Each structure stands twice: as structure tokens, then as C-alpha cells.
């Protein structure tokens, strides 16, 4: 990868993180409780194509989530109750949705991000329940190399920090 592409990737990632943080702050409610009783975001997961922390084939950076291959248009479900804090198209993540799930008993806040959707069917500020359809599997945004093809890119952020979603979310 050229230095120019690396810088562009890092700038896009920083812009996305700033956007998601600002959106979370708009919709965070300290009174919202997160039970940590998550469900699978897809009807079924046959395999994980890229795990959290694995080197990205294109940018050679640690992968920020878990990639779950699925057929185009497969339903994507909210893994838990929460409020949609972002639903938009982003250059690298394509059509994506972030849901703020609230604060767990230990005081940590939880949010999930669903990326590369063909489309989403929720909007910022909307309350969703565990298992609600929030969108459909796609390949929008920057989906090349081993991460290409139709898949759900799922991230879990605890207190704003990316964390391995497979440690918390059934798959």
C-alpha cells in the first residue's frame, strides 16, 4: 500500500470515529440499562471470514470487528435493545448503523456497529429492540481483498473502545 493510501485510510477511520462519538453523545442516556443479553445479528453464521485484531489484507492494520459472510439481502438484527445513534453511508464502512445499548451494571457503556449493509431500515434516534431488523447484508463501502464480498462487519465498542464482539455476542 502506498503512503498516500495509508494516510487516506487513517483519515477516513479518524473521521468515522469522530462522527460515531459525536452521534453517541447525542443519544446516550445514562439511565438506559444494557443487560449484556446479546443475540446473533444474523439468522445464522456459517463462518467468520475475518476476526477482530487479525491483520487486514488490504491495509495491514488490525481488523476492527468480526466479518460474517452472508448472502446479499440477508436480514441483520439488533443484538440488543437500544437507540440508533447513527444510520448513514460512510466512505469506508458503506451503509452502516450504530446502536447505543446503554450502560451495564459495572458502569461501562456498550454500542454496536453494523457495516457494509446494502441498506438500512432504521434512523438516528429510533428505539430498537433485540431482534428487530435494522438492515440487510451488502458489500457497500471499502470491501476489498479477504474482506470483500457480501458480509456483515460487526463491531462492539465498550466505553468507545473497539472490543472483540465475539467475546460477547453469540455467533
Give the residues covered by each predicted segment.
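Alpha-helical oligomerization segments with coiled-coil/rod-like character
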Residues: 1-35
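Glycine-aromatic-enriched surface loops/turns that form tight recognition elements
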Residues: 37, 41-43
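Zn2+-dependent peptidoglycan hydrolase active-site motif and core
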Residues: 61-63, 78-121, 145-152
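Short glycine/threonine/proline-enriched tight-turn/helix- or strand-capping micro-motif at secondary-structure
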Residues: 29-30, 47-81, 100-101, 158
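A residue-level detector for short acidic-glycine micro-motifs
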Residues: 50, 70, 86, 116-119, ...
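Short, well-structured beta-strand-loop connectors
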Residues: 75-84, 122-137
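Conserved, short, structured surface segments that act as functional micro-motifs
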Residues: 95-98, 126-171
Amino acid at each position: 500500500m502506498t503512503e498516500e493510501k495509508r494516510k487516506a485510510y487513517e483519515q477516513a477511520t479518524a473521521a468515522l470515529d469522530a462522527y460515531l462519538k459525536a452521534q453517541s453523545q447525542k443519544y446516550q442516556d445514562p439511565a438506559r440499562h444494557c443487560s449484556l443479553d446479546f443475540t446473533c445479528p444474523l439468522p445464522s453464521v456459517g463462518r467468520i471470514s475475518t476476526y477482530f485484531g487479525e491483520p487486514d489484507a488490504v491495509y495491514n492494520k488490525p481488523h476492527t470487528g468480526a466479518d460474517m459472510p452472508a448472502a446479499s439481502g440477508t436480514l441483520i438484527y439488533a443484538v440488543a435493545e437500544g437507540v440508533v445513534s447513527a444510520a448513514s453511508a460512510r466512505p469506508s464502512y458503506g451503509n452502516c448503523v450504530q446502536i447505543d445499548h446503554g450502560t451495564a451494571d459495572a458502569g461501562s457503556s456498550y454500542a454496536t456497529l453494523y457495516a457494509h449493509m446494502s441498506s438500512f431500515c432504521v434512523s438516528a434516534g429510533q428505539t430498537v429492540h433485540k431482534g428487530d431488523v435494522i438492515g440487510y447484508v451488502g458489500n457497500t463501502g471499502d470491501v476489498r481483498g479477504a474482506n470483500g464480498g457480501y458480509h456483515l462487519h460487526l463491531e462492539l465498542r465498550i466505553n468507545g473502545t473497539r472490543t472483540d464482539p465475539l467475546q460477547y455476542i453469540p455467533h
